[in-house]
Amino acid sequence: MTEYDGKKILIWGYGREGRSTEAFLKRNSAPALIDIYEGDRSGIDEDKYDLIFKSPGIRMDEDDPKYTSQTEEFLKAHGDKVIGITGTKGKSTTSMLMHHVLSECTGRPVILLGNIGKPCLDYYDEVRDDTIVVYEMSCHQLAHTDVSPHVAVFLNLYEEHLDYYDTVDRYFAAKAHIATAQRTGDRLYVGSNVPHIDTYASVTVIEEGREYGYDLKIPGAHNRYNAEFVYRVATEEFGCSDEEVRKSLSQAKGLPHRLEYVGAKGEVTYYDDSISTIPEAA
């Protein structure tokens, strides 16, 4: 028996995450009804359903307890095992580095999922008592959530997605959900350019603009800054040694389109950094 048994459920949005939600519900429970809907909210008969799964990116301006998401449901079940990583830029690289280092240094199973094209409910059944989950979290996945991960990493905040959120304050409020529901005993690692977040977690501020002395395959001071978050989480939360974390970081490879080495001709070296879509990322 699960909490979804016998319920009438609507999946709002049928992209990758919507299809994943449908598969999860059919695999793990026995709802009385599963409907799919891809239109505007005005077309939803909310009284017909007990629960509505909203896909990321579908705009909803106010909270409603009848609405939930993959992120919300995953955190309810496994939030104590999750390292959530967000930020305007750097979250994919940091998530990759975190997964690599913890896989090398802890001896525990580590799952990488989330905003890298891996819907969390696809991995729901793989989480065990000793599992570590590295969850890349977008603003859309965090918006309207009422649960936060045990360890939160908030790298930075710049102006982005204002076509969706209208103001930086609203954009920040969506991302801040990564920490606003944290409790005593939880941890928040936050970049120095991120505004204050009200949280019960213990807070560690990582200074942006400093030079962090990590030997990485991936170039850029911003990646050494990202590596500082990984180092602090690995050593402070999981007891990894300085030597093993630095060695693991030095062996990690980068991601496509993020200062990816292309080649050299003469005295000119070429990198593909096409993922940089705002000036601060360039």
Report the location of each language-model feature.
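Phosphate-binding loop of NTP-binding sites
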Residues: 23, 43-49, 56-187, 192, ...
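N-terminal leader/targeting and accessory segments in enzymes
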Residues: 1-69, 73, 255, 277
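Active-site flanking residues adjacent to catalytic metal/cofactor-binding acidic residues
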Residues: 12, 34-38, 114, 135, ...
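Conserved dinucleotide-binding and phosphotransfer motif residues
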Residues: 28-29, 104-106, 236
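Nucleotide phosphate-binding/pyrophosphate-handling subdomain across enzymes
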Residues: 24, 216-282
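Residue-level detector of alpha-helix initiation sites
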Residues: 16, 89-93, 224
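Beta-strand->loop->alpha-helix junctions that form or flank phosphate-binding loops
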Residues: 37-40, 68-73, 191-192, 200-213, ...
